[in-house]
Amino acid sequence: KLIPLGQSAGQNILFTLAERIPEVVAQSAIWPLDDIGSFTPAQIIASSRHETQYTRLFRS
């Protein structure tokens, strides 16, 4: 939602990151609950602007 991205580019990114998913899942299973969280106001604002963007997520 943060950047205008075509469907093919989005699929390429997902394919590239797919091999890291098991590693990230394993790491997340051992993180203490106190360390899990986020404070990302810029991401929230950018996501809210997504709705009115000319180019939207996976626009064909």
Curated annotation (Swiss-Prot):
One CC-aspect GO term: cytoplasm
Subcellular location: Cytoplasm
Superkingdom of source: Bacteria
Induction and repression of expression: The probable operon is induced by urea.
Record note on quaternary structure: UreD, UreF and UreG form a complex that acts as a GTP-hydrolysis-dependent molecular chaperone, activating the urease apoprotein by helping to assemble the nickel containing metallocenter of UreC. The UreE protein probably delivers the nickel.
Annotated function: Required for maturation of urease via the functional incorporation of the urease nickel metallocenter.
Annotated family: Belongs to the UreF family.
Protein name as catalogued: Urease accessory protein UreF
Source organism per UniProt: Escherichia coli
